[in-house]
């Protein structure tokens, strides 16, 4: 079983960005390669009216995967749109101007291979937040036959 090593010379965060580093629990090489995926979900916590919060918001953006030369360690660079897009349903008759804070995620957050050998290193805008999901399946699915 492999364990997280922070040996690679990851680049420093650029101006206006921050670097987030976290480790994934080892699950065994076979399980990590065949059954698990990591989903990075960057976004921003935005203040909005109760009416707007009842609608579905999303941020445009992208996640680029890079490799630290000579180490094989991966890192990710996030670009996020400044403005969220939203559905426009009218929900509350009396909004009263109340403001709420809501996490708005990047649309179509991609999945990446689960690798506990190295830490997960993500560069994103300073005003952004990173959440993540770990997806693990069981045994391989089989096709149904007639």
Curated annotation (Swiss-Prot):
Disulfide bonds: none annotated. PANTHER family: ECOTIN, PTHR35890. It comes from Leishmania major. The lineage of its organism: Eukaryota, Discoba, Euglenozoa, Kinetoplastea, Metakinetoplastina. The gene is ISP1. Transmembrane segments: none annotated. SUPFAM superfamilies: Ecotin, trypsin inhibitor (SSF49772). It holds the Pfam family Ecotin. This is Ecotin-like protein 1. One of its GO terms (molecular function) is serine-type endopeptidase inhibitor activity. InterPro entries: Ecotin_sf, Prot_inh_ecotin. Belongs to the protease inhibitor I11 (ecotin) family.
């Amino acid at each position: 079983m492999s364990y997280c090593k922070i040996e690679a010379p990851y680049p420093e965060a650029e101006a206006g960005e921050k670097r987030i580093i976290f480790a994934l629990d080892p699950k065994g090489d076979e399980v990590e390669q065949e059954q698990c995926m990591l989903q990075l979900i960057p976004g921003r916590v935005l203040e909005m009216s109760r009416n707007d919060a009842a609608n579905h918001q999303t941020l445009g953006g992208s996640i680029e995967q890079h490799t630290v030369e000579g180490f094989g360690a991966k890192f990710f660079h996030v670009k996020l749109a400044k403005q969220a897009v939203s559905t426009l349903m009218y929900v509350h008759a009396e909004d009263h101007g109340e403001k709420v804070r809501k996490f708005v995620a990047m649309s179509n957050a991609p999945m990446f291979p689960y690798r506990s050998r190295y830490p997960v290193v993500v560069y994103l805008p300073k005003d952004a937040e990173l959440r993540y999901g770990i997806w693990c399946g069981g045994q391989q699915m089989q096709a149904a036959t007639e």
